[in-house]
Curated annotation (Swiss-Prot):
Function in brief: Essential for viral fusion with host endosomal membrane and core release. Not required for virus morphogenesis and egress. Induces complete autophagy through the interaction with and down-regulation of host PYCR2.
Residues spanning the membrane: 150-170
Lineage, highest ranks first: Viruses, Varidnaviria, Bamfordvirae, Nucleocytoviricota, Pokkesviricetes
GO cellular component, one term: membrane
Keywords: Activation of host autophagy by virus, Disulfide bond, Host membrane, Host-virus interaction, Late protein, Membrane, Transmembrane, Transmembrane helix, Virion
Protein name, entry field: Inner membrane protein E199L
């Protein structure tokens, strides 16, 4: 089964690598050097030459630069585009068939993974280029609330609505001058959104 890439941009945030790609027997026949490199990485014996054989989309060379393999399980580490993929990206760190580079090996061997990283199981397909919203997605694994906040960052109108709602809630929670809490109810949403039209 061929895995069709959705993007060929280097450092994009890639898909979840649920497409397994060519079978192991097919890989052994068509790309014996690459399969040997993957086997060596299983025992932490990969070399710089193996890194070149596997390659990546960014390297524009090697097994993982080819459309047929780029989004397959074998390339889930080198093409993930996810920060600390070997530490926090399950399709990479939980997949015995994903090639881990010498750099990945050194980070894991020397226990250099940042503490507190969430293991991302549910990453969906999305694009990005390493900006702060991508960083937020990577570390928070695309949960519903975080996806909403990321989308807000990319839409000024939604950002304005979110700021206004937060300010209204803070204002209502502040104690009144008499030391009592303001028990007024929040204005109905229709009133809030009608006031936005005045901006």
């Amino acid at each position: 089964m061929s895995c069709m890439p959705v993007s060929t941009k280097c450092n994009d945030i890639w898909v979840d690598f649920s497409c397994t790609g060519p079978s192991i027997s097919e890989l052994q026949k068509k790309e014996p050097k690459a399969w040997a490199a993957i086997l060596r990485s299983h025992t932490n014996q990969q070399t710089a030459e193996d890194d070149n054989i596997i390659g990546s989309i960014c390297d524009k060379q090697g097994l993982c630069s080819k459309d047929e393999y780029a989004y397959s399980q074998y390339c889930a580490c080198v093409n993930s585009g996810t920060l600390w993929a070997e530490c926090a990206f399950a399709p990479c760190n939980g997949n015995k068939n994903a090639y881990k580079t010498t750099e990945h090996r050194n980070i894991l061997t020397n226990k250099q993974c940042p503490s507190g990283l969430t293991i991302c199981q549910n990453i969906a397909e999305y694009g990005g280029s390493g900006n702060i919203s991508d960083l937020y997605q990577n570390f928070n694994c695309n949960s519903v609330i975080n996806t909403f906040l990321i989308n807000v960052m990319n839409h000024p109108f939604l950002t304005l609505i979110l700021i206004i709602l937060i300010l209204i809630i803070i204002y209502r929670l502040m104690p009144s001058s008499g030391g009592k809490h303001n028990d007024d109810k929040l204005p109905p949403p229709s009133l809030i959104f009608s006031n936005l039209n005045n901006f």
